Amino acid sequence: MEQEEEQIDNGNTVISIKDLKKSFENNVVLNGIDLEILKGENIAVLGRSGSGKSVLIKIISGLLKPDSGTVKVLGQEVDKISGKALQALRLKIGFSFQSSALYDSMSVRENLAFPLVRNKRNLKTKEVNMAIESVLNDVGLSQTINQMPSELSGGQRKRIGIARTLIMKPEIMLYDEPT
């Protein structure tokens, strides 16, 4: 059995959480959370408003520190790394938070190009354009490529936000209220 667990830890476990706790002042938000997510799994965390779902995602992504417990993402203990190591890990994690977080002054094309140009600077314009067209097709919004976020419905903005996350081809996707 021990060998089986070791094998899981050596490649199939993408997120491992043990006895996670997080409070804000006297409000306990997460208490004793244990979770293991394997490569290829899709997990939904359900709960009422204020139950800690967003906090859990922020801890997994390294945006918040847990009070105690361990959180490993792709084998790295998230609250033990910082700087370039944390930045490199975050590039492997796609985030889609509650708001679409689109730049209002940029077209859909520019919003989708931004993370590619910022994080993968050696891409040619043709490669960027092909990636944009592909991801827009994936979310069914090819026709919006030249529109501004203010011209889109709330659902369309949400899907463009998801497309902006997918365009980076992350190893892990974290969605906070994806619909």
Predicted ranges, named:
Residues I167-E171, E177:
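A short, proline-enriched helix->beta-strand linker immediately N-terminal to the Walker B motif
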